[in-house]
């Protein structure tokens, strides 16, 4: 964007914080495409349904990549057991491939793994009938079957972060899938009631919920799921408010 000399002179007279805001706004509006560094690791979508897509990341052709400024040799020997990344619902898949030198999927591919990622998509109000059972008992078996079909391998390693870890654990327990070779669980609550001070809060809420259920018969499961739909921007605001 070309700025007239008069406008440029006026901007220079503004306080420094205001100039920063204008510069950032200019970048976001007119240079957004140039600023995006995420999702540069090549992948192909090998399967999709109405909402969810399955990504397969392609082998790296270079002999060496940079990881946070440090050179790393690319392993050309592929591990036999594919790695399936199971994300939480409330994140953008860009987080796994954020920068060329800070990319989890690129790092795993460079280490010789066949990397797959289940992209949950962006649920809308027409998906409010989906529940935990939908993801654990329907989507997980469906998409892991496609990974096995594409890779030709029965054994899989699952990498679950946050709610993705819950999906991974529930799937493994409920299906008794003996071909899950490894489980990597990050930031996933296993027993929320035992989580220190936060766990005490959960225990108090549970006691009150039991009292309400006992005395009124009310259960939150009986509410219309559309009333509980949370838009993505609300999740963003909530997480930012917890940032110190």
Residue ranges and their predicted role:
Residues 130-150:
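Alpha/beta-hydrolase active-site loop
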Residues 100-103, 134, 201-202:
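Glycine-rich, phosphate-binding/catalytic loops in enzymes
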Residues 39, 45-124:
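Short, surface-exposed "cap/lid" segments of acyl-processing enzymes
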Residues 127-129, 196:
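Conserved catalytic-core motifs of eukaryotic protein kinase domains, centered on the activation segment
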Residues 82, 156, 181:
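Conserved acidic residues
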Residues 1-39, 75-76:
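N-terminal targeting or regulatory segments adjacent to alpha/beta-hydrolase or S9 domains
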Residues 2-17, 149, 153, 167-244:
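Alpha/beta-hydrolase-fold enzymes
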Residues 159-168:
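Gly/Ala-rich beta-loop-alpha elbow adjacent to hydrolase catalytic centers
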């Amino acid at each position: 964007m070309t700025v007239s000399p008069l406008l440029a002179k006026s901007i220079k007279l503004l306080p420094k914080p205001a100039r920063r805001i204008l510069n950032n706004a200019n970048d976001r509006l007119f240079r957004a495409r140039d600023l995006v560094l995420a999702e540069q690791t090549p992948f192909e979508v090998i399967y999709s349904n109405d909402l969810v897509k399955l990504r397969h990341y392609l082998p790296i052709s270079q002999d060496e990549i940079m990881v946070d400024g440090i050179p790393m040799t690319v392993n050309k020997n592929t591990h036999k057991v594919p790695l399936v990344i199971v994300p939480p619902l409330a994140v953008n898949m860009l987080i796994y491939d954020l920068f060329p030198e800070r990319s989890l999927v690129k790092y795993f591919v460079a280490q010789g793994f066949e990397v797959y990622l289940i992209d949950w998509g962006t649920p809308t109000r027409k998906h409010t009938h989906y529940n935990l059972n939908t993801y654990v008992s329907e989507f997980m078996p469906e998409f892991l079957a496609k990974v096995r079909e594409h890779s030709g391998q029965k054994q899989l390693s699952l990498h679950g972060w946050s709610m993705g870890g819950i999906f991974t654990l529930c799937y493994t327990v409920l299906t008794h899938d003996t071909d899950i070779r490894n489980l990597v669980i990050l930031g996933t609550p296993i027993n929320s009631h035992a989580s220190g001070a936060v766990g005490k809060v959960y225990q108090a809420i549970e006691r009150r919920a039991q009292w309400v259920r006992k005395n009124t018969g009310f259960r939150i499961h009986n509410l219309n799921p559309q009333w509980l739909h949370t838009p993505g921007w609300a999740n963003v605001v909530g997480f930012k408010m917890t940032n110190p």
